[in-house]
Amino acid sequence: MTSNRKNENEIINAVSNHSAQMDLLPDARIEDSLCIAEGNNIDPFVSASTVQTGINIAGRILGVLGVPFAGQLASFYSFLVGELWPRGRDQWEIFLEHVEQLINQQITENARNTALARLQGLGDSFRAYQQSLEDWLENRDDARTRSVLHTQYIALELDFLNAMPLFAIRNQEVPLLMVYAQAANLHLLLLRDASLFGSEFGLTSQEIQRYYERQVERTRDYSDYCVEWYNTGLNSLRGTNAASWVRYNQFRRDLTLGVLDLVALFPSYDTRTYPINTSAQLTREVYTDAIGATGVNMASMNWYNNNAPSFSAIEAAAIRSPHLLDFLEQLTIFSASSRWSNTRHMTYWRGHTIQSRPIGGGLNTSTHGATNTSINPVTLRFASRDVYRTESYAGVLLWGIYLEPIHGVPTVRFNFTNPQNISDRGTANYSQPYESPGLQLKDSETELPPETTERPNYESYSHRLSHIGIILQSRVNVPVYSWTHRSADRTNTIGPNRITQIPMVKASELPQGTTVVRGPGFTGGDILRRTNTGGFGPIRVTVNGPLTQRYRIGFRYASTVDFDFFVSRGGTTVNNFRFLRTMNSGDELKYGNFVRRAFTTPFTFTQIQDIIRTSIQGLSGNGEVYIDKIEIIPVTATFEAEYDLERAQEAVNALFTNTNPRRLKTDVTDYHIDQVSNLVACLSDEFCLDEKRELLEKVKYAKRLSDERNLLQDPNFTSINKQPDFISTNEQSNFTSIHEQSEHGWWGSENITIQEGNDVFKENYVTLPGTFNECYPTYLYQKIGESELKAYTRYQLRGYIEDSQDLEIYLIRYNAKHETLDVPGTESLWPLSVESPIGRCGEPNRCAPHFEWNPDLDCSCRDGEKCAHHSHHFSLDIDVGCTDLHENLGVWVVFKIKTQEGHARLGNLEFIEEKPLLGEALSRVKRAEKKWRDKREKLQLETKRVYTEAKEAVDALFVDSQYDRLQADTNIGMIHAADKLVHRIREAYLSELPVIPGVNAEIFEELEGHIITAISLYDARNVVKNGDFNNGLTCWNVKGHVDVQQSHHRSDLVIPEWEAEVSQAVRVCPGCGYILRVTAYKEGYGEGCVTIHEIENNTDELKFKNREEEEVYPTDTGTCNDYTAHQGTAGCADACNSRNAGYEDAYEVDTTASVNYKPTYEEETYTDVRRDNHCEYDRGYVNYPPVPAGYVTKELEYFPETDTVWIEIGETEGKFIVDSVELLLMEE
């Protein structure tokens, strides 16, 4: 095995002739001290044999993962038998001895003998099975060989079941660990044969399933056992000094090679998950022994006894923290020199810098040890080359027998090869002067031998050099080499006929928020972790095959939270789905916490050098997501057809109950039925035409059942606001008509659009845009009539939302149940790689590859709160108590958006009977119903009183009951006061959506109509245009500097200077009487004057002084808040024709009013009261602010003699503030 390499502890005699100048006695003693001490060292043969066998077996397994060819399998089993039961010394005993030496613990004699005897029996049985398998593979039709194989298989598998506990004896677990791992590997490979050949050599389908389930179970158990006892043994060796670190590192390396590497391959034996050839990769690092003199008689001559650093210091210096897999590109070595005499000197490795690069990533440079030396550094370049072997010489510079020696490395040969170009190979050397009694050769192949000696080592090497640390002390300069397995290739090459596993640490860069964490032991390397949304880093791949080949993505993960996993290729998202957590927060990373999942939607690569990106979104809370690897899985036409048919059959069958295949499940939504129909429609006519027809009939029947149970009218949105012919629309029955109309389809605001089915919806859906004013929301509603409802029953509203923001959903009966939903969506379900997601006739091509949403999660947001839903489904329940056809309370279904950013696209709406109410739910709805009726009785008494007061106030405004003439003394304040009383009538409209009339709508609109008439008549009497300055200075003539300012939400004219003047010419009727009324406020000294006059004479004026006591105008004066917004940009002719232009529009039955109602709901809980709706009051004068304190109102009577008068406003000094100017025609 090692005949072509020098022994690890070979001593190179490097003594020069000048050594004779020194005293012979000291020299003799020194040279004697350099003799190898055999007592306390690992047996070289045992160590090399153990490592060689572990590397050989792992290397061969990597070549037969998935479903190997029959010839491969026969050859592989022959190889295993030869490796584990060779002629000569027992390999299993070598395993035991090696671990015993590493941990310095002897296994008991009884346990040893029992284990070895059982292993010998297993070897004999396995060899017989292997020979029978070969015989059968050569002639599978031979009944005799098939029968023999069947019998031997069952017996051998049972032998392994009985034997495994003998390799896990209590308190002997660690020394037996390598034996256990190799035996477990054989057992799992044997179990795999049941899936590979079981049906052919006589196993029943039930037996095959049982063996498969045992394989899955034992894979988990064996993996966790090996990792647990590996960690136990390793931790037991953790010490405080350098000597303990040497053993610790040897255990870590050798049991990684002999135990953990096998464990990492166990999952790939699953032929159902990996039905074709599979490429796995090991990215873990192992560390060869430090390059320092060891095994020397004199203790100080061993580097780890020569005042070496502590255990923790060595570990920190030699072992990198978890990182992305990278490749060594350049090494620069810095040297130092020490001299005792001309014959005793050494120049040695003191420090270095390393340049390395992850696959497709940037160059990283790190510095180790001391680099501030005066000796010229040596630079070695290894770009695209693997250093597969190092031959390092550990030197000891002796300073006499009474002084501590210096340990250093004066010479290293780095043997390299280019894996892409085998002729590019050679040696890079670091060589420095050395004169001292001896050197020790440290050959890396002694610790990491090639996989075979049948080929040159530059072809069969097992590991490549990846990194170098250095242990540094004043007299210790010891490099430590780090190695990665050769299976981790440089290019992430993807083959068209194999499943390619790519560990996530092969990403080209590490995004912010992603960390590399130490692997749990069974993953074959480190893994990536995220605790928030974001990417895991791009993986650059090389496609070795036609770009037309389609692939799927699989991945292995563990998570403490639910999350959405996205996969993109070259910037285009090709897969996404929501995955559930696999573990609880704080749990240890065990094998069972990792699960393997695969997307079903295939994709193609667009270029030979491409990039795969993965990311997570929508974490269900604070937690951790770990990703081990992704898998690139080739897709074949037969696989797709069979998979699609199986998935469609399962989906169709899942629509119906288990007890009655003609009865639809309650939780099957209308949207889900549409998606199942798409699944069936996309089945291949070529492979499964008959099955497709049968499934289509079933899914059509399911759709009919869904339509029959849906209580909504027109759920497919054929129209909105369609007037039924039989509905009355005359004024006397207007509110009854609204209720009747709402029970016959959808009603909504004009900005809602109905759109035909797309890649999300199979049928019509609606789009609700945002609004610029929350008092004029976008809305959609329908009423479920009382006749459709059953007493004491729970009903459910549900549907599908493609995307939404600020979408409010209400169910209203006794009170409102309410949700506000933000559902993130995408622009399209189709990846950019799909050039034409449109069918031949323009319809969406729902069979094209598309993003995979998860529509099957229920909406979980309750309590009226606004939240983001990662489910596109929503549902909302409401309970119905006693039904009354005369009262026809029904259930109102309302969708509303009241923000500018809001929007929604939704469809497949359903209102279905969920279940009868029983127990506590029944009691709750009865209590809610009683509260509602008690509240209604109180409301009726209150309404009667308020209506009487309001009607008296309204009637007092007019001359008689014809409501066509105002009383002579009616002013705007009186109108506002009456309007306030009218608005005290509650439940005129539903507070959730004021377009829907409430129980008091008729009486409210009756009185409100009279208020509107009063305002109109009052406007007609005032001939001053823009007298309240709500339109600024429009219609006024201005001289000097004046301004209109907002004060207390009112518009005031401010005249700050005595030379300024504001005037307006007003048309009047000669001979008629007018009242000039001014409300104003004077600041400072002087007077404010408002003058009215004709051309030559007939002048009168009102004067205002600071702090004068006058009759204050009623504080209810004001105007419509909406007046400025509606008329502010109008010209003089339009804006000033009427003081309250636009008032009637503001007071009509506004079908777009909004709501400020957000009750809190638990499941089955109802509120006792409804809040007032602030938008309802914004529609009129009721919120117009009163005149602030300090303003006074003065008036005078004026009788013009011509048809034009002038009103002029000015002051003598100080500041004059005018709130309003009115010129009112006197009533006769």
From Swiss-Prot:
Keywords, sorted A to Z: Sporulation, Toxin, Virulence
Claim: Transport is one of the keywords in the record: no
GO molecular function per UniProt: signaling receptor binding; toxin activity
Protein name: Pesticidal crystal protein Cry1Ba
PANTHER family assigned: ENDOTOXIN_N DOMAIN-CONTAINING PROTEIN-RELATED, PESTICIDAL CRYSTAL PROTEIN N-TERMINAL DOMAIN-CONTAINING PROTEIN
Residue spans of biased composition, Polar residues class: 423-434
SUPFAM superfamilies: delta-Endotoxin (insectocide), middle domain, delta-Endotoxin (insectocide), N-terminal domain, Galactose-binding domain-like
Family (UniProt): Belongs to the delta endotoxin family.
Domain of life from the UniProt record: Bacteria
InterPro entries cross-referenced by the UniProt entry: Cry1Ac-like_dom-VII (IPR048645), Cry_V (IPR041587), Galactose-bd-like_sf (IPR008979), Pest_crys (IPR038979), Pest_crys_Cry1Aa_dom-IV (IPR054544), Pest_crys_dom-III (IPR005638), Pest_crys_dom_I (IPR005639), Pest_crys_N_sf (IPR036716)
Described purpose of this protein according to its UniProt entry: Promotes colloidosmotic lysis by binding to the midgut epithelial cells of insects.
GO BP field: sporulation resulting in formation of a cellular spore; symbiont-mediated killing of host cell
Residue spans crossing the bilayer: none
Record keyword Transcription regulation present: no
Other remarks on this protein: Toxic segment of the protein is located in the N-terminus.
Chain intervals for the UniProt region annotation (Disordered): 423-458
Gene3D superfamilies, A to Z: Galactose-binding domain-like, Pesticidal crystal protein, central domain, Pesticidal crystal protein, N-terminal domain
